[in-house]
Design a protein with these regions (language model features):
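Residues forming the flavin
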Residues: 3-72, 76-85, 93-94, 98-204, ...
Length: 614
């Protein structure tokens, strides 16, 4: 029997910080959730210690245990800071007496650990008439099928709006084959890779499902519930730091696509938006290149969600050509750093390292360097691999990936330094080299004003420059430049690997990373590493490996949108969304933004139709 899931019922009491020693868990709960599963019984989630939690909840509320009529687990985490490992729960309890329930909430009003459980049920704002959508131009179009595009399309389909999805890449299983072609055979498919294709960049990542965004409507819960509905492990609903992993995401993404189609939506793969058409500053149509036929066609559209992802550089350039308002924004650049996972486990878990319930340890580090730069760990992947993440010929980019089990030999994370538009290129020749003569000439004749002195595409230019240098330094065959941490700290080139074997495929070439990144970046990282070693013993170990370059930490620009309608102020009917447009960072926040934008589209199409509330 699977673990109960907290619902959105009102007048349920949520209690946090309920702690139990590990020994209190049922024996079957002490195995790792990703342990080998030979039978259907093995695959079921281990039960929570509900009786023990019921006793704790009753004690916290000051009532008899019999007064707790129901209890469900909302979150579970672990506290390994002391000798005895503790399991920490957040639970939702229903009291048998409604009047007592209300009085308890009043009594504990100032106790932050005892609060009313919020209603987390997603309700669609509208629902289209059954016969709606016969005219193609009425149907909303979603450009991009990563986490943002998937959830925009899903909620639009759930509201009866029959969206049309345009995705330049391939279905996820073909995309996986193409991606392995780069990793194993040095062969890049620019249309089907880590960045482009069904599932977006998040498919080839750790599959993290937590975020620091403000989410007062609990839309993140909607995202995770849909993931579970289509095959994600049920424990993502209560794990403190939930993740899915690449292989499991493949199945989930396929299920979400099939649901969108079942509800009347349409998903078109290997089709790329190459231009837009608009009338009176309102979107009218998209020009789409069909790679299967090598033909271009026009798709009428009045509502277009731009869920482009952070690597759709050609689309950004096209939108800029049409004067769609956008601006350069800060992002971060650096490298991937790898250590033996056992080193991180010992540093983080101490004597509990290796415990199956704890799994592979993660970390989060930050340092403010003397040169004013901030160095921090990014997208940490316990028990994972460093992957080749380029989407353009002649460029090298790194990223991190983990499977659900997180059982690979190494831990990796981005080690990155924050940069902002003041660091980006301004030379017209650089713009021409990376973006073409038209933009280069425009930059030459631009007169910067006090409001906007940074070209919106300047961060993109910097990314391309760094990725091209990394490609050359790696040997011009998609191998990546790398260096031992000890050599980097000592400011000398590496000539050979040591005890840590880098996981990046197709391979690495040992160099001095000073030649791959700006000096202010390498100086800040060199200062930070020994200090990180004081926080996590072994982090600055000589044999750890740094592989570059990490340039796509987030989008280098933001496409402007209205705070209420979520539409572009330049062209009505365009809805910039997700990470590529600068409104998310990661799977969960991108999915949440997709839901918000899907709702905005529905409200714009049917401003006077409200869905019936249960």
């Amino acid at each position: 029997m699977s673990c109960p899931i907290a619902t959105g019922r009102l007048l349920v009491i949520r209690l946090s910080e309920l702690k139990l020693p590990l020994i209190a868990l049922p024996v079957e709960a002490r195995r790792a959730s990703d342990a080998p599963a030979e039978t259907d019984e093995d695959r079921k989630l281990a039960p929570h210690p509900l009786d023990a939690l019921r006793q704790l909840a009753a004690h916290a509320l000051g009532i008899d245990e019999a007064g707790v009529s129901d209890l469900t687990v909302f979150k579970r985490s672990f506290d390994a800071r002391k000798q005895n490992l503790l399991v920490v729960y957040i639970v939702d309890v229903t009291i048998s007496d409604d009047a007592l329930e209300k009085s308890l909430l009043v009594k504990h009003l100032k106790n932050s650990h005892i609060q009313a459980t919020p209603n987390i049920t997603w309700l669609p704002p509208v629902h289209a008439p059954a016969d709606w959508g016969k005219a193609k131009q009425d149907r909303p179009v979603v450009v991009g099928f990563g986490p943002c595009g998937i959830f925009a399309a899903l909620v639009l389909a759930q509201m009866g709006l029959k969206p049309i999805v345009i995705e330049r890449g391939t279905p996820v299983r073909q995309r996986t084959k193409d991606t392995w072609g780069l990793w194993r055979k040095h062969v890049l498919n620019p249309r089907s890779n880590v960045q482009f294709g069904e599932g977006g960049a998040g498919t080839f990542s750790d599959g993290k499902l937590y975020s620091q965004i403000k989410d007062p409507r609990h839309l993140g819960r909607k995202v995770m519930q849909e993931f579970v509905r289509f095959g994600a492990p049920e424990d993502i609903l209560f794990a403190a730091h939930p993740h899915i992993g690449t292989f499991k995401l493949v199945k989930v993404v396929e299920g979400l696509r099939e649901e969108i189609i079942r509800l009347g939506g349409e998903v078109r793969f290997e089709q790329r938006v190459v231009d837009i058409e608009y009338e009176a500053n309102s979107i009218a149509a998209l020009r789409i290149q069909d790679y299967a036929t090598n033909q271009t066609y026009t798709l009428p559209a009045h509502h277009v969600v731009l869920a482009l992802g952070h690597s759709a550089r050609d689309t950004f350039t096209m939108l800029h050509r049409h004067a769609v308002a956008m601006q350069a924004k800060p992002f971060s650049i650096g490298v991937r750093i790898e250590h033996p996972q056992s080193v991180i486990d010992r540093a983080r878990w101490g004597q509990h390292a290796g415990h199956p319930l704890l799994g592979a340890a993660d970390y989060k580090l930050v340092h403010h360097a003397a040169n004013g730069r901030t160095v921090y760990s990014f997208c940490m992947c316990p028990g994972g691999t460093v992957v080749a993440a380029t989407s353009e010929v002649g460029r090298v980019v790194t990223n991190g990936m983990s499977q659900y089990s997180r059982n690979e030999r190494n831990a990796n994370a981005g080690l990155v330094v924050g940069i902002d538009p003041t660091d980006y290129p301004t030379d017209p020749d650089a713009f021409e080299a990376e973006l073409g003569q038209e933009i280069g000439n425009a930059v030459r004749h631009d007169t910067p004003n006090a409001v906007d002195t940074f070209h919106p595409l300047s961060g993109l230019v910097l990314q391309r420059q760094l990725e091209a240098v990394a490609y050359t330094l790696g040997g011009s065959n998609y191998e990546a430049p790398a260096q031992l941490v000890g050599d980097f700290i000592a400011n000398r080139a590496s000539t050979a690997l040591a005890s840590v074997e880098p996981s990046y495929k197709p391979g690495v070439k040992m160099i001095h990373l000073n030649s791959a990144l700006p000096q202010f970046v390498t100086d800040a990282m060199r200062e930070a590493l020994p200090l990180f070693g004081q926080k996590i013993k072994g982090f600055d170990m000589h044999d750890a490996v740094m592989t570059g370059v990490e340039t796509r930490t987030s989008s280098p620009l933001r496409i402007d949108r209205d705070d209420v309608s979520l539409q572009s102020p330049s062209i009505a009917g365009l809805y910039p969304a997700g990470e590529g447009a600068g409104y998310a960072g990661g799977i969960l926040s991108a999915g949440v933004d997709g839901i918000k934008v899907g709702e905005a589209v529905a409200n714009a199409i049917f401003p006077n139709i409200t869905a019936k509330r249960p």
